[in-house]
Amino acid sequence: MKSWCKNLLAVGLSVAFLSACSSSDVEEEPVSELVEIQATVFPEISWDTNVGEGVGDYYSQLRPTVRYGKLFVADRSGVVVAFDEVTGEELWSQNFNEEFEQKLRTKTKGLRLAAGVTAARKKVFVGGETGLLVALDEATGEVLWSAQANGELLSAPTVAEDVVAVNTAKGAFEGFNVDSGEKLWTYESQLPNLTLRGTSSAAYEAGGFFVGTADGKVAVVVKNNGQAAWEQPVFSPSGGNEFTRMADVDMTPLILGENLYVASYNGNLVSMELRSGRIIWSRKYSSFNELAEAGLSLYLVDDHSRIYSVDRRNGLELWSNSTLKNRELTAAAVVEGYLVVGDLEGYLHFIDRSNGDVVGRIQVDSEGLYAQPLVVDDKIYVQSRSGKIAIVTLSKQETKVEEDTNASAE
């Protein structure tokens, strides 16, 4: 089945219109088989454990975060766990379904966490498909406050000084007081008839939240009052049906210096002036994955799992890799001289940033990886669909050869 069918969210459309996504008439696109590679880097799992039951086959952007000397992890069912960053020892665990039993009594499917984990201001923030936003004490896991957002929370909250902001699936971008959970303001964007299932997390800079919208724009929302400073279309759709007019901006805008970079589904990768939103350059790429960057290069995984390196000064393509096409790749992360992406079969692939060649891989969990790997120093943190949490580290060819030689001598 085409990947976009699995991620659609209908708003006011008939079931008959969407039935094409499960129809045998929809041509399946082949998943690229893994081919033999010339490995020059050798990833190893240095630590792993399980948290809850994972996210299963559901859409989710839950991913671990590291701060305050701790690794924070959540699962879909409402379990949040803190581990010591160095030793891996479990420090505390919180089960929201027990904590919010009364509030969730009428919600037969539970909390369904899908947004987070964000750690800031000595707190840990997570959100769910019920619209519940929760703040925990980072040291103890105690629930400090909870608040109800106007719609599903499908992307990580953004904390800026005294405000925590969330982007809902109903097109409402809302700000809450970081210490009390009081709702401060709401910015409404237009929600098209058909969108991808997902929302953009916001970036924050100089008093403004920069957030992508479902109608293909980037908006700057002033932290102090929730008003829009400017809006700029990334892509203006003109297709003849709802599918071709989809233009969601579901990634976090990437801010580098005085410029902002972002891509839309069905649309463009653009560079904008941060202050005005003026488009500096625009190139045709379709993506809903987070951008990665290093030096003067942007790295993009498109909607068919093709990987690109683009010069951020002018948008010129430096290289592309389609050997992992349709493997439902995660967004890329940068680790040393490589990109790392996960796939539907639970492999992490390591790609040489200079030329796009795949130079290493390791299978973490056959149930699959779904969210962008988190890189902290020399450690790569990943979360699988089954709930496995793993730390992956790299060994270079020279080290590997030396180890093999020593083993042979023994």
Which role does the model predict for each range below?
Residues 75, 128, 168-169, 213-214, ...:
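Structural signature of WD-repeat beta-propellers
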Residues 300-309, 316-350:
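Loop/turn-rich, solvent-exposed surfaces of beta-rich toroidal or solenoidal domains
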Residues 78, 131, 171, 216, ...:
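Short coil/turn segments within WD40 beta-propeller repeats
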Residues 18-20:
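C-terminal motif of bacterial Sec signal peptides marking the signal peptidase cleavage site
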Residues 84-87, 137-140, 177-181, 223-226, ...:
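Short loop/turn segments that connect beta-strands within beta-propeller blades
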Residues 25, 29, 38-65, 93-118, ...:
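Extracytoplasmic beta-rich repeat domains
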